[in-house]
């Protein structure tokens, strides 16, 4: 069984982890957190979580995931807290930054199995969603996407503990919002599971159209496929392609850089390589020829720009994500013809966003 820490005493945790100790320094707005700083709040959340009936019936493995997520849920209030001119205290963006912190912690410093790590990351990223879902422009789409990243049943459980682990005047209203979130999940068949679609094409149609009906099934199907590789330099994308797709057309940004003598740190040169690669892709797309786009594609923004291009030509897009343990990453990078400087590799690692199920028609993870 994976455990984040066998010892869960707060004093022990503060001594072991600086990022826990510094929670004592982070103040919160007393209107919403009259209990005090982030350290006090986090301890109250952990205590509330333990006594929740829904938590107590979980397996020990699942309890550990939720415990770790609760421990980490406000970790980046440290870097995002602002004392506003009107006297309020805000921490906008702490969930997104907290998710990045959790991924780095559980990939580099305290390695966790991929599925466990990403579930914790998802819980940290979306821990406020049950409260704020209905204030989003498209609550249903936001929910469907979240269900494809994280267990919504656990998310509601974490949100409930988060709300019970504070002192505030609007607690009853916030708990009612969580009840509404649970009901909305159940109504839309994504309570504790990813929302299913009849096909990858139906899923992509819904994701790419603002007014799409959730259960709409498009008549036409894609005629060809683009495989979008994703993974850090040195993760083994080239090896994976040679093994599984030896006969496919490949657009490789690394190979183009090597051929032209362009450094991975040359922004102008890399911009030219990307434009050339896109022009070559358009040639294949117009001919409806299947091919592989081989590059790092380590952020959602990078991937979505390419996926928008590919789907404009009605291609089916499959994301293939490749990962190796961090301890192997630098060694494998050094053995490549197109090796990336260590500082660049670490920067990419710290910005890494794992592909989500909703991003493409199909997604596969290959984690060693």
Predicted regions and their residues:
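N-terminal pre-Walker A segment at the start of P-loop NTPase domains
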Residues: 186-221
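Active-site metal-coordination segments of metallo-dependent hydrolases
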Residues: 30-44, 86-100, 273, 296-299
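Conserved phosphate-donor/acceptor-positioning beta-strand/loop module used by diverse small-molecule
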Residues: 313-332
């Amino acid at each position: 069984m994976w455990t984040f820490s066998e010892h869960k005493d707060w004093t022990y945790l503060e001594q072991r982890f600086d990022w826990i100790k510094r929670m004592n320094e982070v103040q919160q707005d007393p209107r919403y957190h009259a209990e005090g700083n982030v350290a006090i709040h986090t301890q109250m959340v952990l205590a509330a979580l333990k006594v929740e009936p829904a938590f107590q019936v979980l397996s020990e493995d699942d309890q550990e995931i939720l415990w770790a997520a609760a421990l980490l849920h406000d970790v980046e209030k440290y870097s995002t807290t602002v004392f506003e001119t009107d006297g309020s205290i805000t921490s906008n963006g702490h969930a997104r930054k907290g998710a990045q912190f959790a991924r780095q912690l559980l990939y580099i410093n305290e390695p966790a199995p991929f599925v466990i790590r990403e579930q914790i990351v998802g819980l940290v990223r979306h821990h406020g969603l049950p409260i704020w879902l209905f204030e989003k422009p498209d609550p249903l789409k936001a929910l469907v996407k979240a269900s494809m990243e994280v267990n919504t049943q656990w998310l509601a459980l974490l949100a409930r503990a988060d709300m019970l682990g504070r002192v505030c005047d609007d607690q009853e209203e916030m708990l009612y919002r969580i009840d509404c979130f649970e009901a909305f999940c159940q109504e839309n068949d994504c309570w504790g599971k990813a929302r299913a679609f009849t096909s990858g094409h139906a899923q992509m149609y819904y994701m790419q159209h603002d007014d799409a009906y959730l259960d709409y099934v498009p008549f036409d199907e894609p005629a060809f496929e683009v495989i979008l590789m994703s993974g850090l330099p040195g993760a083994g994308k080239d090896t994976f392609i040679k093994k599984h797709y030896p006969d496919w057309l490949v657009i490789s940004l690394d190979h183009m850089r090597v051929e032209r003598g362009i450094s991975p740190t040359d922004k102008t040169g890399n911009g030219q390589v990307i434009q050339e690669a896109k022009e070559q892709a358009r040639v294949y797309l117009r001919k409806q020829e299947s091919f592989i786009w081989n590059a790092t594609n380590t952020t959602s923004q990078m991937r979505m720009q390419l996926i928008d291009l590919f789907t404009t030509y009605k291609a089916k897009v499959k994301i293939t994500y490749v990962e190796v343990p961090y301890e192997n990453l630098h060694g494998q990078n050094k053995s490549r013809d197109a090796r990336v400087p260590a500082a660049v590799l670490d920067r990419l690692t710290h910005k890494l966003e794992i592909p989500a199920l909703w991003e493409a028609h199909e997604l596969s993870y290959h984690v060693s």
